A protein has these predicted regions:
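Carbohydrate-recognition beta-sandwich/jelly-roll modules
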Residues: 83-450, 455-468
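Intrinsically disordered, low-structural-confidence terminal and linker regions
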Residues: 21-71
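Short acidic catalytic loops
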Residues: 218, 233-234, 468-477, 511-517, ...
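Sec-dependent N-terminal signal peptides of Gram-positive bacterial secreted proteins and lipoproteins
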Residues: 4-22
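Active-site-proximal substrate-binding groove within the catalytic cores of carbohydrate-active enzymes
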Residues: 87-89, 94, 98-107, 311, ...
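Structural alpha-beta junctions
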Residues: 231-233, 260-264, 465-466, 506-509, ...
Length: 788
């Protein structure tokens, strides 16, 4: 083992806070109060960081000895399970009446069940029959009566609920004589087959089809189950749905809502949610919380909003870290799916996570200018097929890193991700060129950075050793910057811009023009309100008031996707003539909505349009793009540094960066506005995210009367030394892992992480204010070490 010496980084560079100081770095982290160590430990133990995995032997032994599900063949027969599919690794058992499934790993005998197992361990009746019928069935159907359409009238029922099943016992166990089958045995003939029937067909070596006939409501549809090498998939095609009773309409389906659920605090693992950069909910504590969010953001076509940002169509449940778990991926149809999670509390003894596939959604039909109306349903269902896969994770793959690796491998197998990492640590250099400032009559152009200034700043950065620059020009048009996109190609200094493009291309670097064709505002001269602004499902214009802190509210517009596509097509020749790498899109990669345009169009139509737009360009940079844009992505901008910070989250983890590591370069939000100082830089190294700055030649005070006044510190002269020092500090770590993939990340002790890469490099990051020695490596306070 060779410990890399970072001798090129003098100690005086360690205080790389945005507020420059030349004090000794140890003074910056020294305790200022008597209980500083306690305060620091509380901070490092919070959900802003990743925590140490469960290591208590008694907890691990209890899980291994008492909660290791392994039914015998006789017990499976008694419960009605049939071995439907098998391969060299797995057995898949299926019980059709309840639509329940058990996946068995042949090597270990460990079973993952679609039912919440170990019911009744409190030795009392834990749930009433209605709740048990929901829990013990693997298919939930959401429906509504057509004469009573409202959110409160939605019915969520399982097959057992519809069949009015009842049980032989109340489900309580005698811990001295446990019978795992006891909570699930039905009373003879209690399942009403005249209300619902499930049949299987097309059974072969790797798949079978189930047909669900809900005679009570006049629903009939097919679901396919396919065994894969390391898991199984569920396929649902809405074209198979028949609705023969006009009194009822199908809204959505939940497949295996309790698959892999964890009881109370006995499972020493966690739930993985792709919220923001990544979040964990550890299953060793009670939360009494629920979580619900649409994938790929809110659908404003339904006036639905969500705080969460789910850019990846995946989730996971780890029963025991580095031993066993699973993860779920929506391969097709994620734009119509909602992530649902319930955690142990007053209403449930289980942690569970699942998806709901929405084939219809209620919306408000507005009938007058006052906004009066009624709730209605679309007559047509979403016709986008759904496919979700469940993949078993074992040994060192059973972790959030293993989930990132598995999902990355799936993306690579489908050619949905490309290997584009450079050979030197890149830095995004965004520059504000022009903005509009108010005058007595209208506005006038304010030039913050001329083309000559752009060249000068680039050259100085290269002299400071920053040779791999990703240049993003903001406000490059005469239109200005904030809220004025999509810009016209009116170029105040066309030749100067061409010269910049030629120099950047000659250096083998990238230059993007920031442009937004999907989201605009009342300030854009290129948008006509009546023609271009989309209508939502309620036929209202998608114009929303943005209240700003400076009391200058703006009406933000969402355009028809077809209009956005047409405007991009009109600009293709212009951007190619300039020689730009492509466009940098703020919203194209993260905004999907349903809309009305003489007919109602759902998110699939929008998704197809925006991906077609991205495919028309040879290269794209995007801010916080969702997974559907990864095949067309060259640079990921504005990587979130946190999640939505809900109080049920226990850990912050780099799920999204690790999915992209080794393939797509990712960049942090602008470090000009870094309020976390050294901690933020260490997190960038820990998460493998590259630096980013927003710069101007003129002082940012020039922007004070413009809509860009939120950029309160941008002058290159103010940041020149910080940029040089911060880049050198970060690149001294990231240079060694370019093109490498993450093998493992572990928290050795609170505030100290170790990240191992497939090229043999290991990074140690110490978030503590005191030196730490681990693996015979001493890491200075608030610092890192690289081991080759």
């Amino acid at each position: 083992m060779f410990k890399l010496s970072r001798f090129i980084i003098p100690m005086i560079l360690l205080p790389v806070l945005i507020v420059t100081t030349q004090e000794d770095p140890t003074l910056m982290v020294a305790p200022r109060v008597d209980n500083f160590a306690f305060i620091e430990n509380q901070l490092l133990s919070s959900s802003r960081y990743t925590q140490v995995d469960e290591q208590n032997e008694s907890v691990l032994n209890r899980f291994e000895e008492d909660f290791n599900l392994q039914y015998t063949n006789e017990q499976l027969d008694l419960l009605g399970y049939e071995l439907m599919l098998e391969n060299n690794q797995l057995n898949l058992y299926f019980e059709k009446d309840s639509f329940s499934l058990i996946l068995e790993d042949k090597t270990t005998g460990y079973m993952l069940s679609s039912r919440p197992e170990f019911q009744g361990y409190s030795e009392t009746r834990e749930d009433n029959t209605a709740n048990r019928n929901l829990m013990n069935s693997g298919l939930w159907i959401e429906s509504i009566r057509t004469n009573n359409i409202s959110s409160s009238a939605i019915k969520v029922e399982s097959l057992y609920t519809i069949a009015d099943a009842s049980y032989q016992t109340n489900g309580s166990q005698d811990l001295a004589n446990i019978d795992w089958t006891k909570p699930y045995l039905l009373e003879t003939n209690s399942y009403q087959r005249n209300r619902v029937q499930v049949t299987t067909s097309n059974v072969n070596a790797s798949s079978f089809t189930t047909t669900i006939n809900v005679t009570n409501y006049g629903f009939e549809f097919d679901i396919n189950i396919i065994l894969q090498s390391n898991g199984f998939s569920v396929q649902f095609d809405p074209t198979t749905v028949q609705e023969t009773n006009d009194q009822y309409r199908l809204l959505g389906l939940q497949f295996f809502p309790y698959f892999g659920s964890a009881r109370e605090d006995v499972y020493p693992g966690y739930v993985v949610i792709p919220d923001g950069v990544g979040a964990l909910v550890r299953t060793n504590q009670r939360f009494d919380k629920t979580y619900q969010s649409d994938y790929f953001g809110s659908d404003l076509g339904y006036l639905r909003t969500s705080i969460a940002d789910l850019s990846l169509p995946i989730y996971g449940m780890i029963h025991q870290v580095d031993r066993i778990g699973f993860y779920h991926e929506i391969v097709e149809g994620a734009e119509h799916a909602t992530l649902l999670a319930n955690f142990w509390g007053r209403n449930t003894r289980y942690h569970r996570i699942t998806n709901r596939y929405n084939v219809r959604r209620i919306f408000r039909n507005i009938i007058n200018r006052a906004g009066d109306g009624q709730d209605v349903l679309p007559e047509e269902m979403v016709m986008q097929p759904y496919e979700g896969t469940y993949q078993l994770l074992k040994n060192d793959q059973a972790s959030y890193v293993g989930i990132a690796q598995s999902y990355q491998a799936n993306l690579e197998a489908r050619q949905s991700i490309r290997s584009l990492e450079p050979t030197q640590t890149p830095m995004q250099v965004a520059m504000i060129i022009h903005e509009q400032e108010p005058t007595f009559f209208g506005t006038s152009r304010l030039t913050m950075t001329s083309m000559d200034d752009v060249q000068t700043i680039r050259d100085r950065l290269m002299e400071d050793g920053i040779e791999e620059q990703v240049l993003v020009l903001k406000g490059w048009s005469d239109d200005g910057l904030a809220y004025r996109q999509p810009y016209y190609f009116n170029l105040p200094d066309r030749q100067g811009l061409i010269d910049v493009m030629e120099d950047v291309n000659a250096d083998g670097q990238h230059v993007y023009l920031e442009q937004d064709y999907l989201v605009s505002s009342e300030l854009s001269s290129r948008v006509q309100f009546n023609r271009d602004v989309a209508r939502n499902y309620s036929k209202l214009k998608m114009s929303y008031r943005l209240n700003r802190l400076d009391n200058q509210p703006i009406n933000e517009y969402y355009l028809y996707p077809s209009i956005a596509e047409q405007k991009l097509a009109n600009d293709l020749d212009a951007i190619q003539d300039l020689g730009a790498t492509g466009f940098a899109f703020p919203s194209l990669g993260n905004t999907l909505y349903s809309y009305y345009d003489d007919d109602r169009f759902n998110r699939t139509e929008t998704l197809n349009t925006v991906t077609s737009m991205a495919a028309s360009l040879s290269a794209n940079a995007m801010q916080r793009p969702s997974a559907y844009m990864f095949p067309h992505l060259n640079h990921y901008l504005d990587m979130p540094i946190t999640n939505s910070q809900l109080d049920l989250f226990t850990d912050l983890v780099p799920l999204v960066p690790y999915v992209l590591k080794g393939y797509i370069p990712t960049f942090t939000p602008y470090l000009n506005f870094n309020a976390l100082g050294k901690e933020r830089l260490l997190q960038m190294i820990d998460f493998a995210v590259n630096p980013s700055y927003l710069l101007t030649e003129k002082p940012s005070s020039e922007l004070r009367y413009t809509y860009s006044n939120k950029y309160f510190t941008t002058a290159y002269e103010d940041f020149q030394d910080d940029i040089r020092d911060v880049y050198a500090y970060i690149a001294s770590a990231l240079d060694h892992i370019l093109g490498a993939k993450v093998l493992n990340r572990s928290i050795i002790q609170t505030g100290v992480s170790r990240v191992e890469y497939d090229n043999g490099v290991t990074l140690y990051i110490n978030y503590r204010s005191t030196p730490v020695t681990v693996d015979e490596i001493t890491i200075s306070a608030l610092d890192y070490e690289v081991v080759l």
